[in-house]
Amino acid sequence: MAIVQDKYAQSLFEVAQAQGVHESVRQDLVEIKEGLAGNKAFFAFAEDPKVSSEKRHAFVEATFSGVDKPLRNLLSILADKKQLALLPSIADYYTEHYNKFNNQQYMKVESVYALSSEELDEIGKAFIKRTGYKKLLIENVVNSTLIGGIRATIGTTVYDGSVANELTQLEKSFHKQ
């Protein structure tokens, strides 16, 4: 099913980009996703087969009247197809297309203590050189199991410079001998 969400997101991104509204559509999708997080009433409504198309459209018009036309059109299609519950994952895929277009990526930096903004900037600069991305959107997560050092995750790639990893590698080398 994820293929469907990605196709919706890609089509939405292409249309929004052509109309020059891809940034505001991304912001709207982020807000929509945050607003729907844990909203059981929305998902019950969205997945209820008894709810008519007219009620779904009325909901979309009343709730999302302030969003750009490409997003309103997608919401209308999702209402017709009874797929409004796909919105959160469509938002995620849209963000992936947006990031790819802007040559940027999310980066999670795990460390034993919270890093300062200067430290995160330095780490970001080093990884920008290493990865070729124009921009890294960095999130710092405290993880005391690392013992020391950092573990950075960009997309599906993990760069592990933690003391815990070094100890694990050392232990493996002892077992080989």
Swiss-Prot record:
Gene3D superfamilies (alphabetical):
N-terminal domain of the delta subunit of the F1F0-ATP synthase
Task: Name where it mostly resides.
Answer: membrane
Q: Which family does it belong to?
A: Belongs to the ATPase delta chain family.
Q: Which HAMAP family match?
A: ATP_synth_delta_bact
Q: Which UniProt keywords apply?
A: ATP synthesis, Cell membrane, CF(1), Hydrogen ion transport, Ion transport, Membrane, Transport
- UniProt-listed InterPro entries: ATP_synth_OSCP/delta_N_sf (IPR026015), ATPase_OSCP/dsu (IPR000711)
Q: How does it sit in the membrane?
A: Peripheral membrane protein
Specify one Pfam family. Answer: OSCP
* GO MF annotations in UniProt: proton-transporting ATP synthase activity, rotational mechanism
Q: What does this protein do?
A: F(1)F(0) ATP synthase produces ATP from ADP in the presence of a proton or sodium gradient. F-type ATPases consist of two structural domains, F(1) containing the extramembraneous catalytic core and F(0) containing the membrane proton channel, linked together by a central stalk and a peripheral stalk. During catalysis, ATP synthesis in the catalytic domain of F(1) is coupled via a rotary mechanism of the central stalk subunits to proton translocation. This protein is part of the stalk that links CF(0) to CF(1). It either transmits conformational changes from CF(0) to CF(1) or is implicated in proton conduction.
Keyword Translocase on entry: no
Q: Which SUPFAM superfamilies match?
A: N-terminal domain of the delta subunit of the F1F0-ATP synthase
This protein's record includes keyword Transport: yes
Report the subcellular localization. Answer: Cell membrane
Assigned GO CC terms: plasma membrane; proton-transporting ATP synthase complex
Protein known as: ATP synthase subunit delta
